[in-house]
């Protein structure tokens, strides 16, 4: 009967020959999942792209839809300009 040391050396040698990973304690490493091809691009192409409100308005070429987020942004911007916190005059050109 072969000793444990000889069997371990045989396992190390066979893993080098066949290109497999040698694990002395037989633990799970998850290598099978790490080596697999990533599926992110396939899954992403399956679902349609999300479209936001601004893109919808440009697709429909209709400016009658009120965009509350844009209006709020412009309101805040005008308030900051009134307070003197807007862009400098050299940048407004």
UniProtKB/Swiss-Prot annotation:
One family from Pfam that matches here is MRP-S33
Localization recorded for this chain is: Mitochondrion
What are the UniProt keywords, alphabetically? Mitochondrion, Ribonucleoprotein, Ribosomal protein
Lineage, top-rank taxon, reads: Eukaryota
Q: Which GO terms describe its molecular function?
A: structural constituent of ribosome
Biological-process GO terms, alphabetical: mitochondrial translation
What are the record's GO terms for cellular component?
mitochondrial small ribosomal subunit; mitochondrion
Its function?
Component of the mitochondrial ribosome (mitoribosome), a dedicated translation machinery responsible for the synthesis of mitochondrial genome-encoded proteins, including at least some of the essential transmembrane subunits of the mitochondrial respiratory chain. The mitoribosomes are attached to the mitochondrial inner membrane and translation products are cotranslationally integrated into the membrane.
Q: How does it assemble?
A: Component of the mitochondrial small ribosomal subunit (mt-SSU). Mature yeast 74S mitochondrial ribosomes consist of a small (37S) and a large (54S) subunit. The 37S small subunit contains a 15S ribosomal RNA (15S mt-rRNA) and at least 32 different proteins. The 54S large subunit contains a 21S rRNA (21S mt-rRNA) and at least 45 different proteins.
**Membership in a protein family:** Belongs to the mitochondrion-specific ribosomal protein mS33 family.
PANTHER family xrefs:
MITOCHONDRIAL RIBOSOMAL PROTEIN S33, SMALL RIBOSOMAL SUBUNIT PROTEIN MS33
Q: What is this protein called?
A: Small ribosomal subunit protein mS33
Which source organism does the UniProt entry give? Answer: Schizosaccharomyces pombe (strain 972 / ATCC 24843)
Q: What is the lineage of its organism?
A: Eukaryota, Fungi, Dikarya, Ascomycota, Taphrinomycotina
């Amino acid at each position: 009967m072969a000793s444990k040391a000889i069997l371990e050396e045989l396992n190390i040698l066979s893993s080098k020959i066949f290109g497999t990973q040698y694990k002395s304690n037989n633990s799970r490493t998850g290598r099978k999942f790490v080596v697999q091809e990533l599926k992110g691009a396939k899954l992403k192409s399956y679902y349609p792209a999300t479209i936001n409100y601004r893109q919808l308005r440009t697709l429909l070429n209709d400016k009658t839809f009120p965009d509350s987020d844009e209006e709020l942004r412009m309101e805040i911007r005008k308030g900051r300009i009134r307070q003197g916190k807007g862009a400098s005059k050299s940048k407004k050109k």
